[in-house]
From Swiss-Prot:
InterPro entries: AA-permease/SLC12A_dom (IPR004841), Amino_acid_permease_CS (IPR004840), Amino_acid_permease_fungi (IPR004762), APC_YAT (IPR050524)
Primary location class: membrane
Protein name stated in the entry: Arginine permease CAN1
Similarity section: Belongs to the amino acid-polyamine-organocation (APC) superfamily. YAT (TC 2.A.3.10) family.
The organism's taxonomic lineage, starting at the top: Eukaryota, Fungi, Dikarya, Ascomycota, Saccharomycotina
Region entry Disordered, spans: 1-29
One GO process term, biological-process aspect: L-arginine transmembrane transport
GO molecular function: L-arginine transmembrane transporter activity
Entry's localization field: Cell membrane
Amino acid sequence: MKFRNILKNEKNEKNEASASTSHASEDIEIIPSRYDNEKFYSATEATHKKKTGSTGFDDTISLTHTLSRSRIPTSMEDEDAEEAEVHDTRVKRALKQRHIGMIALGGTIGTGLFVGISTPLSNSGPVGALIAYIFMGTIIYFVTQSLGEMATFIPVTSSITVFSKRFLSPAFGVANGYMYWFNWAITYAVEVSVIGQVIQYWTFKVPLAAWIGIFWVLITLMNFFPVKIYGEFEFWVASIKVIAIVGYLIYALIIVCGGSHQGPIGFRYWRNPGAMGAGIISSDLGEARFLGWVSSLINAAFTYQGTELVGITAGEAANPRKSVPRAINKVVFRIVLFYIMSLFFVGLLVPYNDPRLSASSAVIASSPFVISIQNAGTKVLPDIFNAVVLVTVISAANSNVYVGSRVLYALAQSGNAPKQFAYVTRHGVPYLGVICTALLGLLAFLVVNHNANTAFNWLINISTLAGLCAWLFISLAHIRFMQALKFRGISRDDLPFKAKFMPWGAYYASFFVTVIIFIQGFQAFAPKFDVSEFFTAYISLILLVVLFAGCQLYYRCRFLWKLEDIDIDSDRREIDAIVWEDDEPQNLWEKFWAAVA
């Protein structure tokens, strides 16, 4: 039963809440939560354990705990309660398994893959870049495993921010929420800035600013459609990406084996100019190569961002207990096929010292995918692949706005953003979140008045660090989640999805993400300190610290929740009670996409 229906009438809900509380008080001590600004109530199990010796997960304690955590309007909330009757604040669970998989894929396969890998290839060489991407791939694998375990157990919208607040502290949750929104809003600016440059591959007759403005409007409007239409659009567009990358891998294999005028290429470019790049900054070759490799880690992190989007879509998934684990389990497949294999073949077909990799005028001209096709002398295909890149970037930008709007929605739902951001259209779209996220995307116009590559790299650095902070909070939240389960006597074997290689995987990801966060701005210190470079590299970290400190002072809460205060019941029981429709693939076509998505 959904508790919002039980508490429909204000007078009845007060009486029922009072009756439920008095009845439950025989077994449970109800204590107002000190730190929750939503006026929720938390129920402790101490008295119940003392009397019954149970673990706190029998039917009585579960029902009472869930009810006690449901929002109960008080006299101070009459105005908000009346307004809630006018403004709908519930998103729709309309995303199927194939939608969720492709949304995550759409947010990941974009500028970072098709354009961004040119920098690590130039700085680190094919082998150095490959090692960097494999290493970052292991980190994102453990991050998504951690998120998957929590998101299937408690499938809520923008779970990445919700879990930080619930399992770490309110300050962590709010700071992470705003930083994660900032990350995707900035990424939207990155993607939109590239769209115009992709089109300029064909013509310069239309100003770059015009293309940026046109596609900014179109993509923003696209996000006002119902989530089901959005999911369907993203599914088919992301399908084009999958077909294009698989097609490129087959094409690249043919070229490597001698299918062009160049003859068999094999590992020719790994021998000359070499498998490892010349590095950056330092005159010492070893040091320069190491610094170049560290720089490649940052590009790899940007490329992988979006893999965790399954956690954002959990709150709008039609069957989260099945669809989210399936999407999570395909992460390894995606990392190997779409990133590692693509980078491997690009490294075989393009030498790291090709001057086009570091082109400063047109970003798309530096795409190693396009360069490799041009080197092979295949006519028309560069134009076709450029069209694929255009569709890819539009899809990625579309996902950016979707994620950003849902993060603001989750913050408003928890009382940490203006309540207006929780208002949705009759189709369940948080329209103010879409508008606010899109407005920050106007930073894309920076590339018009500045060197394209400089502005592009500036936006990437800001976005990447904000995304790395989100990965860190996911891993830390999962560590606390596992500790809370153990404290409550719950075996992880009984969860809908059990993350692999835990808890060591979460510790591994937390440690290396922290290291990368602090060393990623090394170029600000070498060869001499550069103030501008420093703020570009660390502005996201500075914002995070300010947000966290402000939230800590505002909430006056503990640095971390006590294990006994961690809430692992809210939003879970309602999902447990729902009987979902069968979403199993029915024909060969559906089975194919189920395997891919």
